[in-house]
Amino acid sequence: MNTPKRVCVIGAGPSGIAAAKNLLDQELAVTVYDYGKEVGGNWVFSDQPSHSSVFETTHIISSKTLSQYDDFPMPAEYPDYPSHQQLAAYFQSYARHFNLYPHIEFETTVVKCELDQNNKWKITTSKNGKITTTFFDALAVCNGHHWKPRYPEYPGTFAGKLMHSHDVKRFGIFTDKRVLVIGGGNSACDVAVESCRVSSRTDISWRRGYWVVPKFIFGKPTDTIGGFLRHLPPVIWRKTTGAMIRTFQGRNESY
């Protein structure tokens, strides 16, 4: 009987657990390392600055229809755009359903990954101050891209408080303050929307134009009815999508 190949998966978030499940389906020996205490990655809310978690009010921006696993649908009672608590519970249910927990080593940091002369991955990990080295036949990196904040450089001096969205957990810190949000990505828009509820004023700065897409069109999640447009030629798709957004949202300047 052949010994199954060993695969290391870094991260027990949505991608990591999906990778682990499918690798186990192929009868491979899988070990998942995650520095957190629970399945879910950044969907597990935490006030700890070192953990790049969602905000306290975060809901997913894609519908549950297009965000769920094909082999494990989200609960029928979930809303179209579930909260971070519901998402974390869903990922943990997925891990329990497919018996992934025995393969996950929590509170473990991957220190180094090296490919040796025998094409084996030498994985160095740290847990509770103990350094361990383990060899694997393959490596799947599923740690995401939100864990390390990147700061832009601006000339001059700013006398106020400068923060990265990575450091924002709760929005009471913006109470009665004037806030400038730089960027038009998901995190920037979330910070702008949530901070304006408590701030004296919130402005958002974009270096280029963005379409702000409504979550619902005709009472349906937008991403579930717009998919057919993707089959159109790009020029027609852009014009059609732009016309739809202008019809339902108007101009950004109106807001």
Residue ranges and their predicted role:
Residues Q68-A89, K239-Y255:
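Conserved N-terminal/central alpha/beta ligand/cofactor-binding core
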Residues T58-I61, N99, E153-T157:
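Short, conserved catalytic or adaptor-binding loops enriched in Gly and charged residues
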Residues P79-W147:
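Feature captures the FAD/FMN-dependent oxidoreductase FAD-binding
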Residues D47-M74, D223-I236:
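N-terminal glycine-rich dinucleotide-binding loop that anchors FAD/FMN and/or NAD(P) in oxidoreductases
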Residues F45, E56-H59, H103, R201-I204:
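A short alpha-helix-loop-beta-strand transition element characteristic
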Residues T3-P4, C8-V39, V44, Q92, ...:
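Rossmann-like dinucleotide-binding core of oxidoreductases
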Residues K37-E38, P73-M74, V110-V111, N128-K130, ...:
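Conserved beta-strand elements of beta-rich interaction domains across eukaryotes
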